């Protein structure tokens, strides 16, 4: 097999358009710019893109045109490439690197471009100025083909009760973590600020960050007029920022093809380990303070091929944990066995709240940044993790300038996914009725920084009873009740759950 089937990343491109107006770059403009930056980084001509055999676009939150892969292929002269759209999920970019590295190793692909972008800041400005959607539609001959099935990451019942709101779900995970750790509300809140103040240190030094501003732990943790609560305990500064104009692109090929294209060996970045897992449905999980799918992902990224078998988390000099919310970072840190006081930075970009999270495509920016980081620090290793939905889909990759020894391979993800799938779901009901106990919760806030709605995940019975059915319910917006929920640890509190006309309700005793 050798060089012909050894996958390498050879070119990366990133664009952040902080200065913008109604006539600024569209989503496809940003993707095209990033693609050409990746070409420039690889040291090859734009005409080389005509030789792509595959082109994959990571879906934007709101697709700006009928078929973005076809439009981008037409723009860059890659019309012979097979064109795909990667559906929703922040795991997408790392999944693509993992999947197409395997395709290259198997001789099924030779030269691939991945790209993605969001221009939500510009789009929002256009809507405010004109009252119309951005005029970004471009001619396409057909609808896009999805690389994998585009499935909902929450059920209709879960969505009705607010679990489609990412801040709300991750805040519920955060409260479960706080309770499990035995922290007080005040202690844990400051800890969230301390976690993310280090992210702002990185963002402040980045030319690609949307908010290159260093903030203190207290500034991040304290709710103010400019930093309101979104979903308690999360303030605005703890939330992924998607109102941005950002893009990224990656070029993946084989060592043999790279040399045919004239790409210098010092551009080569090797994938030394990778993994992909999926979590159970939101209500079917074992708990909300940890993730079994993340645990298996962490195990497998260091174990699933010969290249990474001798590596561990202590060998990772550079890390970018997916960072949509603090619980995602802290859970990854704990899952990988890192201590709270580990001196290594947990981001190389500044993270989704401060670098900016280009929708589903953020991890393409973090991979691009990791490529640049390990090129600068030759011989080092970098770990990137990715998370889609509500801890729903996970992916990880290890990057280095060090060549992979022997043939590149990886364990079929289906083999370890089966272990996860074989664990029975926690029993749940859509129509709870009777005595119940809070398992976790959050309070959703309005733009006036006032609590609007409580959301509870609970059990009909005791928390320690594995047969106790799980449910999701709303807590009426009585201000004194909602305020109490933000001042005390309510996990383990009892109440009555019932099915209303449309929504489940929970009344605290």
In which residue ranges do the predicted regions lie?
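Gly/Pro-rich active-site capping loops and adjacent beta-alpha segments
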Residues: 392
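Polyanion-binding and phosphate-handling cores
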Residues: 381-384
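A conserved active-site cap/scaffold subdomain adjacent to cofactor or substrate pockets
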Residues: 355-363, 374, 379
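Conserved "HGTGT" condensation-loop signature of ketosynthase/thiolase-family condensing enzymes
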Residues: 1-85, 105-109, 113-256, 264-354, ...
